[in-house]
Amino acid sequence: MTLKTIEGTFIAPQGRYALVVGRFNSFVVESLVSGAVDALVRHGVSESDITIIRAPGAFEIPLVVQKVAQRSEFAAIVALGAVIRGGTPHFEYVAGECVKGLSQVSMEFGVPVAFGVLTVDSIEQAIERSGTKAGNKGAEAALSAIEMVSLLSQLEAK
């Protein structure tokens, strides 16, 4: 018995990609942006098909992503930012609302929204996840976006 499997590839289908980037903690976020752009280009996306849109911080990212999704001109959206835990509950509010909002936008508009917003306990963890020991989560999010565009195009063609 042969099971039929449908899965996305890492070869970017035609289309434009939006990176919605929170400016807060920019010393980490800019590495995520570089990683995402590099991954997209290496997998076949032209630089002219990548648009970077900057939001003030992670809390504002979901609204910007929603406005971008409403325009229907991007194959996928990659959300990038960094929320670093401090001594107050602020971290939980910002991180939780960001995740919830991005998920809602993806489901509402049927557009892949890749999550590349770091939610970490320390600056050291943020640095590790933006290009050192733990890889670059911006690049990983970009690859997820490519894979989802590929997968959804296959599902829509069936």
Curated annotation (Swiss-Prot):
Disulfide bonds: none annotated. Keywords: Riboflavin biosynthesis, Transferase. (2S)-2-hydroxy-3-oxobutyl phosphate binds at residues 87-88, 129. It catalyses: (2S)-2-hydroxy-3-oxobutyl phosphate + 5-amino-6-(D-ribitylamino)uracil = 6,7-dimethyl-8-(1-D-ribityl)lumazine + phosphate + 2 H2O + H(+). Its EC number is 2.5.1.78. 5-amino-6-(D-ribitylamino)uracil binds at residues 24, 58-60, 82-84, 115. One of its GO terms (cellular component) is cytosol. Belongs to the DMRL synthase family. Catalyzes the formation of 6,7-dimethyl-8-ribityllumazine by condensation of 5-amino-6-(D-ribitylamino)uracil with 3,4-dihydroxy-2-butanone 4-phosphate. This is the penultimate step in the biosynthesis of riboflavin. This is 6,7-dimethyl-8-ribityllumazine synthase 1. The lineage of its organism: Bacteria, Pseudomonadati, Pseudomonadota, Gammaproteobacteria, Pseudomonadales.
